Amino acid sequence: MKKSVIALVVVAAAGGGLYFANMQAENAIKQQLEQANQSYRDMAADGEMPEISLSYQDISANVLTSSYSISGLAVAMGEMGTVATADIVQMKGLQPQGLSDSGSVKISGIKAAAAVLQMLPPQTSAYLQGLALHGDYDYAYTDSGELMFNQQTRINDEFALNYSFSLAQMQQFWQFAKEISALPPEQQQALAADEAYVGQMLEKLATGALKNGAISIENNGFIERTLALMAEQGQTPDFATAQGLALANIAVIEQIPADMKQSLSDFISKPEKLSLSFGFTEPLQFAKVQSGELAEHMVSPEAMIKFANVKLTAN
């Protein structure tokens, strides 16, 4: 019996401790949002930007999984009121104050608010009202100095822009970033406007190198639908005419290799997916780019394409 009571006490204490830790994490995020709003108010008062403020419906945190979420996020701008909303922002591996070696952010359901829609022509307003923007971002840093990050931005299920990059020799930059992120938010905001800080950051970044990367566009009717609306309003030619003009322009560009021209032409003729990738035999050191040591590889588009081993494929 005593053992059961002790076990219950331990479980209750652990549960209470977890609840308190989660509440503290939620309060830290709320404080950061309020500090961001105060910073926006200060900059608006100084005439540096319009008056912007952030609000939310709910914030939750789970310190065991290092995950946080902000529901019902809204962005307001001065007298216009709410201009954009997001259903939910989910973060994992991120710290309210500090920089973890891996993390991710997912934003779902970004939409234009009524204050924006009512300012637009009826057709444009109806079109924009049917669009929802979604974003996924993640990064990872390893002890070997490699930093990898990926992002996907989607519009409904009609369009996606994806990219991923891998960098090397990022130890100095990452250490600098960790030190800065450990500072209080107000101190970080002050440093962002400090030229000396920006110079230090660029100096640390120059010690790194770019290994490889990829960018892709996926289209499922979004380009056609957007051009149709713009053509209806007299802003652009119709889709078929725009296709013809684009194909004619590609045909006369001499600096692009024939296989890349073909890929571009294939995508324009049937806009489904266009992918570009590159990778260096040895990581491209930013310091060498700055110093001009790699000038021989930058003399022409052809030289750059060969140096970076650029590949372009369609559909």
Name each model feature, range by range.
Residues 7, 12-315:
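Glycine-rich, small/hydroxylated-residue low-complexity segments
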